[in-house]
């Protein structure tokens, strides 16, 4: 990639239909883990006009009112009126869960003891990434995209813009010079709205109240292209506008396209599923590498075979920004991080009901107390082992 270029990422709000599905799936996972932390959960959700379907595989001793959890989640998001196309009180909720296949369970059922050789729940490859573009060590385009839809939700909830509705999407294009963010080129924000708001008033309010307060002043250079509801009317949205499915926003959930993705979604999956836990571990590793000052960008790939504890591969790429070689960093990763599935669960304390909060506005780059994978507690040890000075972002 050239050093001067434009890069774009997008995000969606908690009221986007796919995110409604993700949040229901993770709310169900949390409710199960609260009662039985060794449960096996793969909770999938479909939501359409007036309909929610819960399906997947769940093996647990927990006694859960799945229908009520789905309704409560829809209510929290803000779909509390039949005019919105789905209403938590009146929507139909269908439940069709099976138990986990015994053929899969045999490789992961040693989770109750202290043996760290629990096998991976599936084969696959996962990536983690960090860079020094923001204090959170995230790529700037996805970081700003998340903050825009977060602010849309905040102004909707507190009534400052009462005509806002739950569904929204954002997109940010950043100009890079010498490989670093230089300026904001384009901001797109589409928001669902009440039918009586005029488009010019909507556009002015969105630009002045949502977009401008979110953008860093040092990146505003020249005229930014603001595209607000570029098709015009956006009254029909949420699950009425599009069918929502768990796991369809995997790039929004991670790095906005700035890093590869192994293809496995996160929401609704207990941490024995390496699609989720190993991706969290990858972020933890990459963030500590950058926080340690070993590199300004770090990409981690880890892969697994079903029923096998040790990763089949671990790869580190610092894109030429490393202060020591990638081979040295890879060796340090293997020494300082236990990337076996049970080791990850223990290292990041993942058998907790912490997942609903991850299901909107990104799983990474948020300083939430439950997000153990955002800690930089390994950075000092990595820096000392590599013989470099850590950055100021060690926490």
From Swiss-Prot:
Subcellular location: Cytoplasm
Record InterPro entries: ADOMET_SYNTHASE_CS, S-AdoMet_synt_C, S-AdoMet_synt_central, S-AdoMet_synt_N, S-AdoMet_synthetase, S-AdoMet_synthetase_sfam
Pfam family, one: S-AdoMet_synt_M
Catalyses which reaction(s): L-methionine + ATP + H2O = S-adenosyl-L-methionine + phosphate + diphosphate
SUPFAM superfamilies: S-adenosylmethionine synthetase
Cofactor note: Binds 2 divalent ions per subunit.
GO biological process: one-carbon metabolic process; S-adenosylmethionine biosynthetic process
Group of enzyme by EC: transferase
Binding-site residues, Mg(2+): 18
Cofactor(s) in the UniProt record: Mg(2+); K(+)
Pathway in which the depicted protein is active: Amino-acid biosynthesis; S-adenosyl-L-methionine biosynthesis; S-adenosyl-L-methionine from L-methionine: step 1/1
Binding site for K(+): 44
Superkingdom of origin organism: Bacteria
Keywords assigned: ATP-binding, Cytoplasm, Magnesium, Metal-binding, Nucleotide-binding, One-carbon metabolism, Potassium, Transferase
Catalytic activity, EC: 2.5.1.6
GO cellular component: cytoplasm
Region (Flexible loop), start-end ranges: 100-110
GO molecular function: ATP binding; magnesium ion binding; methionine adenosyltransferase activity
Purpose: Catalyzes the formation of S-adenosylmethionine (AdoMet) from methionine and ATP. The overall synthetic reaction is composed of two sequential steps, AdoMet formation and the subsequent tripolyphosphate hydrolysis which occurs prior to release of AdoMet from the enzyme.
Family: Belongs to the AdoMet synthase family.
Protein name stated in the entry: S-adenosylmethionine synthase
Organism of this sequence: Burkholderia vietnamiensis (strain G4 / LMG 22486) (Burkholderia cepacia (strain R1808))
Gene of this entry: metK
